[in-house]
């Protein structure tokens, strides 16, 4: 799934299919509305051979696949190497913080550095599709719409200016949450709990 110039699309190889067009309007054009139709998305993804591609994929046209999430949570100290780098202890429960949804930006957009104390962290982004409360652990994956990758930018000067640390503020400035380039469904992976990501500068 992709957001191409603010229109929902499916990607295969280097071409895209406009979802509103191939579904005759059954799937909305607006990406945040389109993702509410998970079953239809999978249906059309399975039968793309029946449709003519809308065009070629251009990285410059790709917007954040989930441009306006209702919530945006992060989990701190979620990599062992990062825990060691920070000379911290492994938390007994996940250390959850928020990144304001207003920080979400396109995968190739510029990041506005506010100071020379800005830092980056490559992250796996998990997009929740079907909502719910008190979801049993065994059913958790059924609520995941898909994955993409993102950068968790932080202004460490703001974040650690005083104690307690201001995680939410330091990580939520405009452009500090680029994500994308596509949203990949979990059934594309043999084991969605065993994935690797790489960050290059």
Locations of the language-model features?
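N-terminal non-catalytic cap/leader segment that marks the start of a structured domain
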Residues: 1-94, 188-190
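Glycine-enriched loop-and-adjacent helix/strand subsegments that border the catalytic/binding cleft
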Residues: 63, 69-201
